[in-house]
Every structure is written in C-alpha cells, then in structure tokens.
C-alpha cells in the first residue's frame, strides 16, 4: 500500500510538471520548471502578430515558477522566456505555426467522440502481425489514392484508406513520427518538402504539416 501511495504521489507530481498551461474561461495558469525566474508573453497570433502582454512569473517551489493571467485567453498564444530566447515550453500540447508559440486551448474539447472507449483489435500472438510502416504523407498523397484529405491525419479516417490496408492483408501499422518536427516549413505546405520526421520540436504536439 505504501508503494502504491508513493507511485500515485509521483504520478501527481509528474502531471503537475506536464501541465505548463491550464486554461479556464476565467483565467489561464502557466507553470514552468526552470533554474531561474522567467516571464510569460501572450500573443494574438501563433506567428508574428501582436504582443498583448508580458507577465512576470513568481516562485512556487524549487525551480518552479507560475503566473496566472485573468480573462478568457482561448485562441491566444504564449511563450516562456528565462533570458535565453522564447519557447512554448518542453511540455506544450498545442502550438502555432512551426511550433514557435504555445496555443491556449481547452484540452477538454480536443478528444474525438468515443476516444476513451476505443479498443484495438485483439491479436492472439505477435506472430500473427502483418506490419506496414507508414508515413502520413506518403500513404495518402498520390492523386490515384482517391483520398480527399491527402497527406493529412484525417486521411486515415476515410474508409478507402483503411480498406486498402485490409486488402493488402495488413493488420498492424507502424506510423513514422507524428509529433511536431522542424524540417517542414508549415508556411509553405504547397511547396515540395519532405522528411521522415525524426527532428522533433514539440514532442507532445501533432505536426502541423499533417493537420
């Protein structure tokens, strides 16, 4: 029981660290683990745009800093700065174009319907797996695919995409990196750009190039 209590305590502490931005309609709380005091900057846009506010953070424990900004900031963007340049933070879950600023969103509204109850098919043995290595863009971008959302995350929500895998006898998919990565400029998605995605910028954010 003591071991379980210790694990639960550590889990709660970890969750506290992971939540660098906690939104509610009345206020947004920013939290940062850093060796020195920093500031939070609020912007009206995910790239360029206007600086709306700079807020000094206050100490809230060892190497922990917080700032509370009153008002409804949904749809705005933020960065942290401890004197070495601006960053959306290590644990950002949503960002603007090219991942340079964190996005202030309501995380309770992000999951699709039935997200928490979705179950994968049962595989009796690893030997039964027929695995296809998939790149989001490669799999769906060809004109002959018949897919509407070519090169996007939404491509795999289309029946044709899944049926093609079934027709090939595939029952498991290994998807190449889906997180926000650096080498594709999201302001130029109509130009020829390509990478597998092993150059992460924001580990906890889906890449904007596929969004």
Q: Which stretches of residues belong to each language-model region?
A:
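Conserved hydrophobic/aromatic pocket- or pore-lining residues that grip, position, or stack substrates
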Residues: 132-134, 173-175, 203
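Aromatic- and acidic-residue-enriched carbohydrate-binding clefts of CAZyme catalytic domains
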Residues: 145-155, 185-211
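Short proline/glycine-enriched turn/loop motifs at strand-loop junctions of beta-rich domains
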Residues: 33-38, 135
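Catalytic domains of carbohydrate-active enzymes, especially glycoside hydrolases
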Residues: 159-181
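Non-cytosolic beta-sheet module surface loops
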Residues: 31-35, 71, 177
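Bacterial Sec-dependent N-terminal signal peptides
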Residues: 1-15
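The feature marks proteins involved in alpha-glucan
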Residues: 11-29, 59-133, 138-151
């Amino acid at each position: 029981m003591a071991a379980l209590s210790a694990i639960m305590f550590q889990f709660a502490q970890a969750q506290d660290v992971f939540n660098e931005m906690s939104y509610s309609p009345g206020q947004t709380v920013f939290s940062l683990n850093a060796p020195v005091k920093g500031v939070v900057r609020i912007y009206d846009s995910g790239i360029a745009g206007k600086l709306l506010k700079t807020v000094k953070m206050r100490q809230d424990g060892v190497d922990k800093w917080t700032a509370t900004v009153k008002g409804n900031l949904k749809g705005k963007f933020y960065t942290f700065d401890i004197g070495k340049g601006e960053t959306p933070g290590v644990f950002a879950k949503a960002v603007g174009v090219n991942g340079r600023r964190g996005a202030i969103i309501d995380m309770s509204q992000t999951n699709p319907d039935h997200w928490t109850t979705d179950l994968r098919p049962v595989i009796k043995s690893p030997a039964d797996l027929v695995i296809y290595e998939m790149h989001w863009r490669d799999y769906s971008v060809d004109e002959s695919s018949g897919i509407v959302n070519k090169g996007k995350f939404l491509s795999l929500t289309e029946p044709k995409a899944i049926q093609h895998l079934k027709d090939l006898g595939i029952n498991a998919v290994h998807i190449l990196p889906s997180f926000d990565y650096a080498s594709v400029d999201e302001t130029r998605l109509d130009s020829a750009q390509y990478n597998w995605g092993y150059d992460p910028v924001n580990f906890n954010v889906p890449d904007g190039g596929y969004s």
